[in-house]
């Protein structure tokens, strides 16, 4: 139960921070391009790289700290960071084909799922 609470707590903080970054980007850059989403995804990817190296590899941090910061905080801030870490991990293990398939499938199927979701809801409207 404590693990779920840690994920929820980290996720709440990450989600609120994502909201503020999005609002900041909207005020700074305007709404013609999704600058907020781009910023969160890039920053989240950098931070998950830092966390993965420091927490998981250098300091052998507890499962609870990993759940709080990586699954919770970064999961709430951006799930794109988890996708990116998974892809890089495949390449680092020498599984380039699997990494390429994972990237193509993740992007392609995710875009297709959004299109399908939009189509279903538009058909029901």
Curated annotation (Swiss-Prot):
Residues the entry annotates as binding Na(+): 75, 78
Q: Does the keyword Kinase apply?
A: no
| Species in which this protein is naturally found | Rhizobium johnstonii (strain DSM 114642 / LMG 32736 / 3841) (Rhizobium leguminosarum bv. viciae)
Q: What is this protein called?
A: Fluoride-specific ion channel FluC
Compartments annotated for it: namely: Cell inner membrane
GO CC, alphabetical? plasma membrane
InterPro entries in the record, alphabetically? FluC
According to its UniProt entry, the function of this protein is described as:
Fluoride-specific ion channel. Important for reducing fluoride concentration in the cell, thus reducing its toxicity.
Q: Characterize the regulation of its activity.
A: Na(+) is not transported, but it plays an essential structural role and its presence is essential for fluoride channel function.
Recorded topology in the membrane: Multi-pass membrane protein
Catalysed reaction equations from the record? fluoride(in) = fluoride(out)
Q: What is the lineage of its organism?
A: Bacteria, Pseudomonadati, Pseudomonadota, Alphaproteobacteria, Hyphomicrobiales
Keyword line: Cell inner membrane, Cell membrane, Ion channel, Ion transport, Membrane, Metal-binding, Sodium, Transmembrane, Transmembrane helix, Transport
GO BP annotations listed: cellular detoxification of fluoride
- UniProt similarity note: Belongs to the fluoride channel Fluc/FEX (TC 1.A.43) family.
Q: What HAMAP family would the database entry show? A: FluC (MF_00454)
């Amino acid at each position: 139960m404590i693990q779920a609470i840690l994920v929820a707590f980290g996720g709440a903080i990450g989600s609120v921070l994502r909201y503020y970054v999005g609002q900041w980007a909207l005020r700074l850059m305007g709404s013609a391009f999704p600058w907020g989403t781009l910023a969160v995804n890039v920053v989240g990817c950098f931070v998950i790289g830092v966390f993965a190296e420091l927490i998981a590899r250098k300091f052998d941090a507890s499962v609870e700290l990993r759940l709080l910061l990586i699954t919770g905080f970064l999961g709430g801030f951006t799930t794109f960071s988890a996708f990116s870490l998974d892809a890089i991990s495949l390449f680092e293990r020498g599984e380039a084909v699997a990494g390429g398939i994972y990237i193509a499938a993740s992007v392609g199927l995710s875009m297709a799922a959004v299109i399908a979701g939009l189509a279903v809801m538009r058909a029901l409207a």
